[in-house]
Design a protein with these regions (language model features):
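Condensing-enzyme catalytic core of the thiolase-fold
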Residues: 1-621
Length: 621
């Protein structure tokens, strides 16, 4: 798969860079390169190289199904499996698309991630036992799941099979808090409450909560405290708790989809599934029998005479990202009545999505094209951001550039933390990941070099020593290493430092990533979920993989914008720098009657500019 291929590709690339430094002479280097080619092959041809960038993960699915417009990778770390559902729902709310396919996939369980995760004490030495008092950590798992979404009215009109009805979904961020990977009640409670608000539901309206619970002590405890706050005051008895990870293990970006599918199956079979592996329930469950019910054997899911079965499904991720979905079992009569009641609340259809730019911030690396993947040459004001200097090398350059650009952005404008979100659009695959993989997987590189034929063993060991010396300049893997190379943490750092509490995510749509971020941000604004959104892109990779895919031609920089809705802009024209509209390529072709060589992607147009004292004009420029 694309992510796994990318991880292996950049390892091969950085190994060759280290060899180049250790053995400058091309003739002497040639036999060692042959050994690396055999053990750590890299893709030579540009077309193939473009297929291993992470954004390529979505394209085979789109091609298989004949989808023309949008194929986007959504990254919210372990919240991704429900974040993608929440994001997908935005494309249904304004009737842009009759269907949206949301997929969660995990199939790149590489050693780099496992070693890094172990440094924060997250891995179990035994088994996955979420919600158990003695749970010792998570067990990584792989898998994929998909749900096809469409408007309820459309499904009823066309007699489609409906497995469940999403009444609300939300993604909320912790904002300023503890470590970037520490769970936080504030964001978790906010996500669940916002999801419940989609149906105006109270605590007694929820039968079951499918927890994110991974089996880590800190994570399970914080989530149970969050659920306790949501469920306290129930009059209808305790809420059922579930976790599927003792069966599937932790699928990271696929975990949320696994939770959702499990709940749909439970509704279909009208039963609560047991939480396997629990010997001693978590002490918060034991101490609050009036709030929590943990099923250790299958149990009947009682039916409520006045409403369908209903559940909350959670997925939380590093970077303080918390996604929650409120779903209920399909009942034809109940939901037909619901469609009639809510038919007037659907947002009007519109082709283009427009946002008003009210502030901008930009930061460019001082050394544009110098150096290689082995070099870390991006300056960072660690004193201002209160980051210990020893941790700076573990933060990817994109994270540092994004922080500085956003500092400049917010020097111009203030934000309301609760009403602001972040959507960054940028190619995935951070440069520091290559260095981290090289450091951790050095034995693979050394083994390949020692397999070199027709060279004196003493010469081989000298080359090995040279490569090992280069690797020694890379900091050892520590607690801070994992978030330092996670793509979604580029947005997560901004939320944590600047106290942003709305949705937070990174989108990868290749060259169209920035336009994709504007497109989705406009939907959150139009739906009234946020008043302000930070959009933009931060990119600092010099990898040949990104160059071959045409993604590294603009140097290393970060550009961010604070955007607001068009409705707000009409009331405050004096504060608007410009208004931009984003459309898909096919929409532009239909509007203007021409054909483009592009078969997918977005088009950004400036449709308004300031007009001296008279405000702003809606003339397309």
């Amino acid at each position: 798969l694309a992510d796994e291929a990318y991880d292996h590709e950049v390892l091969g690339e950085i190994a060759r860079l280290a060899l180049l430094e250790a053995v400058p002479d091309p003739e002497e280097r040639r036999p060692y390169e042959a050994s690396l080619d055999h053990s750590l092959p890299v893709v030579d041809d540009n077309a193939d190289s473009a297929r291993v960038v992470p954004s390529a993960l979505a394209h085979p699915v789109a091609t298989l199904l004949g989808l023309q417009d949008r194929a986007v990778v959504v990254d919210g770390a372990c919240a991704s499996g429900l974040l993608v559902v929440d994001a997908a729902a935005r494309y249904l709310h304004d009737r842009t698309s009759p269907f949206v396919l949301a997929v969660g996939a995990m199939a790149n369980m590489a050693i780099t991630g496992n070693v890094s995760f172990s440094k924060i004490g997250g891995l179990s030495e035994t088994d996955s036992t979420p919600l158990d008092e003695n749970a010792s950590g998570l067990v990584p798992g792989e898998g994929a799941g998909a749900v096809l979404l469409c408007p309820l009215a459309y499904a009823l009109e066309h007699g489609m099979t409906v497995y469940g009805v999403i009444r609300g979904s939300a993604t909320r961020t912790d904002g300023r808090g503890r470590a970037i990977y520490a769970p936080n009640m504030r964001g978790q409670v906010s996500a669940m409450r916002h999801a419940m608000a989609g149906g105006n539901f109270a605590a007694d309206d929820i039968d079951h909560i499918e927890t994110h619970a991974t089996g880590t002590k800190a994570g399970d405890t914080e989530e149970l405290l969050s659920v306790k706050e949501i469920a306290s005051g129930r009059c209808s008895g305790p809420v059922s708790l579930g976790s599927v990870k003792s069966l599937t293990w932790h699928g990271f970006p696929a975990a949320g989809i696994a939770n959702l599918v499990k709940v749909l199956l439970c509704m279909q079979h009208e039963r609560f599934a047991p939480v396997h592996g629990v010997k001693t329930p978590h002490k918060l469950i034991m101490e609050n029998p009036d709030i929590f019910a943990l099923h250790r054997a299958p149990a009947t899911w009682p039916v409520n005479d006045s409403r369908p079965r209903r559940a909350l499904v959670n997925a939380f991720g590093f970077g303080g990202v918390n996604s929650s979905v409120c779903i209920e079992q399909f009942d034809k009569q109940y939901h037909a009545n619901l469609v009639r009641v809510e038919s007037d609340t659907v947002l009007p259809s519109g082709k283009g999505r427009a946002v008003a730019i009210v502030a901008t911030g930009r930061c460019q690396a001082t050394a544009m094209d110098n150096g290689t993947l082995l070099d870390d040459d991006i300056d960072f004001d660690w004193r201002y951001f209160k980051v210990p200097p020893v941790l700076v090398p573990h933060m990817d350059g994109a994270q540092r550039l994004a922080l500085e650009a956003t500092r400049r952005l917010l020097a111009e404008r203030q934000i309301d933390p609760d009403r602001c979100g972040i959507v960054l659009g940028q190619p995935a695959g951070l440069e520091v990941l290559a260095r981290r993989s090289f450091k951790i997987r050095l034995p693979e590189v050394v083994s390949a070099l020692r397999s070199t034929q027709s060279v004196d063993s003493r010469d081989i060991e000298a080359v090995v020593a040279g490569v090992e010396n280069i690797a020694s300049s890379i900091p050892a893997t520590v607690e801070a290493s994992l978030p330092g190379y996670m793509d979604n943490i580029v947005a997560g750092r901004l939320a944590n430092v600047f106290d942003v509490r709305g949705p937070s995510m990174v989108l990868d749509a290749g060259e169209a990533s920035f336009a994709a971020s504007v497109d989705l941000a406009a939907r959150y604004l139009d739906a009234g979920e946020c008043d302000q959104m930070i959009v933009g892109s931060a990119f600092a990779s010099r990898s040949r993989v990104h160059r071959a895919a045409g993604l590294a031609s603009q140097g290393r920089n970060a550009s961010v914008m604070l955007v607001r809705s068009l409705e707000w802009a009409r009331k405050h024209p004096e504060e608007v720098l410009a208004v931009v509209e984003v459309k898909t390529v096919s929409e532009v072709e239909n509007d203007r009657g021409f054909s483009s060589s592009a078969n997918a992607g977005w088009v950004l147009e400036t449709m308004a500019t300031p007009q001296n004292d008279s405000g702003w004009s809606e003339q397309t420029t």
